[in-house]
């Protein structure tokens, strides 16, 4: 779907900061507030903006640190439905945060979040690898998140400029 | 210690300290200042550029380069100018890499001025122009831009020309007004330069940062390459102020003259910065696009906010400044800036430091995060309320 420059601009602003107010969006794009609201409605209706979420650094919240694993999954695609059916069987589990179809050495990349390594291990061995079309899984645990979806978790935000300059 | 005669040069003695300095001193000691007074990008230099400079150090590129700069960099500059601005310079003889646009302006003026030669300086403008003309032995003749949008009136320019006039200095997009001159306006200035046989020193350092129309370089105007000294650099567009890297382009005769001054006074621009500049031109464009988009949004936000506050503000075509009028407050630029700083801790620069016609305006840089701009606007709103007549 083709977007106008201003619609694209709004998508880009919200992708960086979904809490930007409609008034500020309007000012930044030189639209009126009601025009901005119309654009937002359109973007939401078309599922171009799918959801407004926050990036949370769970590692800072005691008792909620959790673990994330990326799992390479090899599967046998099914006649007629290809990878879509098995992908659906996997992404419906609530533990599963992302599922991507990949080129290369394996087929699906599955990201799982759980409370503990044990919990993830249990999910992989009991749910994932027992699915009919799954041939093999390789699990990688994430040790530390430095940057996630374009956001650096501990950015150096100090302004090093002098306060007034020509 | 003082000698009987006094040891300072008369020219230097007579230079006024920049009005910006006072505000710097005032703001520096304060806590919690939201600064709209900064004349440089709020972005850090793109990582790919910083990384290339680190690599150049690791590999030991720590010696002088050719006086005019690394040939590879000059070639890249030539390609960049052709591609983006449709102007052609020979990298071997018409481009000099300098220590910022600042030094480019300096060697340009020193190469063309004899004592008492006059240079028309269109104000409001960057604070260095007139002092650099004086230091080069010339006489700066200020010509005031028109308050309505800060464009240049051809009639005023014509009226200021004397037999001693050697050059016109322009800057588009402009610091402090953000005003960009379009092709037609450049053509009018070009016509004057041709009829009175003048050079044009065109400071195009903000050419990357334009938001509405595409950019036209003075050197791209028909017949103007021969009488234009094009000044530019990496500071603003590529967020590289601290690297001190700029360049100057001019026809061979002028370039070779400037190269003499450059060779004796500077030798060459910093080598590490030159390697960084090379990377910026080769691989920095995507980040420049991102920065430009971000500036455009903030410009729109600032223009709309100031107009809503009742401080009339034209929408500037480029750079990262807005220049709202504060005349409705009944305060002078200096009073407005000083009281705003003391009462609300928002730093802006009074317009009069950029020339007489800047009185009644303040320069607000939007090279700050949107959160800071929002906070600044909030404080200015409160300030205006407290100062309602
Ligand atoms: C109009 C103008 N010209 C030149 C310069 C100096 O730039 P550089 O950092 O390349 O010396 C500035 C910096 O503020 C400027 O605003």
Locate each region found by the language model.
Chain A
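A compositional/biophysical signature of low hydrophobicity enriched in polar/charged and small residues
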Residues: 1-166
């Amino acid at each position: 779907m083709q977007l106008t420059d201003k619609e694209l601009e709004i998508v880009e602003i919200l992708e960086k900061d979904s809490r930007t107010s409609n008034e500020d969006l309007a000012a930044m794009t030189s639209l009126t507030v009601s025009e901005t609201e119309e654009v937002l409605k359109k973007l939401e209706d078309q599922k171009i903006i799918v959801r407004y979420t926050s990036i949370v650094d769970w590692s800072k919240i005691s008792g909620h640190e959790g673990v994330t694993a990326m799992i390479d999954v090899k599967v046998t695609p099914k006649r007629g439905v290809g990878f879509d059916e098995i992908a659906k069987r996997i992404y419906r589990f609530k533990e599963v945060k992302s599922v991507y179809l990949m080129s290369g050495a394996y087929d699906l990349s599955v990201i799982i979040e759980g409370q503990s390594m044990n919990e993830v291990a249990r999910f992989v061995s009991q749910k994932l690898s027992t699915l009919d079309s799954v041939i093999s899984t390789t699990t990688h645990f994430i040790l530390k998140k430095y940057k996630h979806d374009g956001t650096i978790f501990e950015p150096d935000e100090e302004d090093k400029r002098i306060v007034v300059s020509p | 210690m003082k000698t009987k005669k006094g040891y300072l040069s008369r020219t230097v003695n007579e230079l006024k300290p920049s009005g910006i300095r006072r505000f710097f001193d005032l703001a520096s000691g304060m806590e919690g200042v939201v600064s709209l007074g900064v004349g440089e990008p709020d972005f850090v230099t793109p990582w790919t550029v910083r990384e290339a400079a680190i690599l150049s150090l690791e590999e030991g590129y720590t010696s002088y380069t050719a006086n005019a700069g690394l040939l590879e960099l000059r070639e890249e500059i030539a390609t960049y100018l052709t591609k983006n601005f449709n102007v052609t310079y020979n990298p071997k003889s018409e481009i000099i890499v300098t220590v910022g646009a600042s030094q480019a302006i300096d060697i340009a003026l020193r190469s063309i001025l004899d004592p008492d030669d006059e240079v028309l300086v269109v104000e409001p403008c960057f604070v260095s122009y007139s002092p650099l003309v004086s230091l080069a032995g010339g006489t700066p003749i200020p010509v005031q831009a028109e308050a309505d949008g800060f464009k240049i009136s051809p009639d005023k320019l014509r009226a200021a020309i004397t037999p001693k006039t050697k050059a016109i200095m322009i800057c588009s997009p402009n610091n402090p007004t953000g005003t960009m001159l379009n092709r037609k306006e450049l053509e009018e200035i070009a016509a004057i330069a041709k009829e009175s046989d003048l050079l044009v020193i065109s400071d195009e350092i903000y050419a990357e940062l334009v938001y509405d129309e595409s950019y036209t370089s003075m050197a791209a105007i028909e017949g103007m390459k021969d009488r234009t000294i094009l000044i530019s650099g990496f500071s603003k567009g590529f967020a590289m102020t601290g690297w001190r890297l700029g360049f100057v382009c001019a026809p061979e005769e002028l370039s070779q003259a400037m190269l003499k001054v450059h060779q004796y006074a500077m030798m060459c621009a910093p080598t590490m910065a030159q390697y960084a500049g090379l990377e910026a031109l080769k691989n920095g464009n995507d980040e420049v696009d991102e920065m430009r988009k971000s500036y455009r949004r903030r410009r729109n936000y600032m223009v709309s906010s100031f107009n809503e506050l009742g401080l009339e503000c034209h929408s500037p075509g480029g750079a990262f400044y807005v220049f709202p009028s504060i005349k409705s407050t009944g305060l002078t630029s200096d009073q407005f800036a000083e009281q705003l700083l003391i009462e609300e801790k928002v730093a802006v620069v009074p317009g009069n430091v950029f020339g007489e016609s800047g009185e009644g305006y303040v320069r607000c840089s939007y090279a700050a995060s949107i959160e800071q701009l929002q906070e600044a606007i909030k404080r200015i709103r409160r300030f205006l309320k407290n100062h309602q007549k």
